[in-house]
Amino acid sequence: MFPTKNFKTIKGKQILSDLFIGRPLKMNIVDNKLLMIDKYEGKQITMIDLINTNKIERIANIGEGPNEFLNLRDITYNSKNNSLAFFDGMLRQVSFYKINEHKIQINNNTFHRKVRFNADCPYDIVAFGDYFLANGCFNAKQFALLNSKADIIAEFGVFPGDNTGVEVENSFFLKNQTTLCTNLGQSRFVAAGYFHDQLVFYRFENNKIIKVREYFSMNAKMVSRHTKDGNQDIYSSSENDETTRTYRMLYSTKEHIYALYWGIANKDFGKTGKVCYILKFDWNGNLKEGFKVNNLLKNIAIDEISNCIYAVTYPDTVFRSVEQPKITRNIQA
């Protein structure tokens, strides 16, 4: 679907060993700090100073008390009010904290508010300005828009591929599962498929969700089952050897959205010579450029000011700085 043969090959330089990292899940760069959802030493987040990478802090205690989390799954930055939103998948809540004087702290002084969600949104929840976004299956729609009280006020988005079994909702979600990412001003967002290659761009304007652009060419390769219980149709899905892992994550900057793409089937996962791709789009969905990496990256964070891509390799969880060809200097440890 994209001209990967024309993508530039980029290489990385290790800046921190795996001894410093637990199991990194997701990364954000805010005020020259690299935040990593990374359960380690009783904390949920590892924070690395990108000016001095030897300066590492652990924040966000594990627990159910004030300013604690059980299972962080997403961190969203809002550039309009200079705040961070933390989504706890186990507690089903989003907690907001303000950034004061360029200091990122999770305590009573920086706490702003928190919002709890019910089982109507069983998967990912992302802060979106005064609203929230959720993925899943909502009356055959892919996404839901929620207000500040966590009430669903709109359901939208139709999966462009095979919708057989969509009425089963949670079971069907494996076939059309997506990851979500907003822009820094939280007026636009992108969704990308985990096992299919849907990539769809939306903007929020005049209290309406508007689709800007959509790419799609491949359904999820799953084993689908159809049985009957009396007059009721029952559908289920599961992975097989042909199931292909497509987009792994999205990362937003002020001007662009980056997509990390694998395109590797389960049967090929143990083979050597695997590569991945980083695609760079503007917020209207136009592909600006792409990069090829001769390794598998688990997740990425982009610093466009210093022209660096920070990444964690798979499966060694080694932290790297990946150079783009136009970079003139490395980030030194």
Predicted regions mapped to residue ranges:
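Flexible internal linker/loop segments at domain or repeat junctions
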Residues: I209-L250
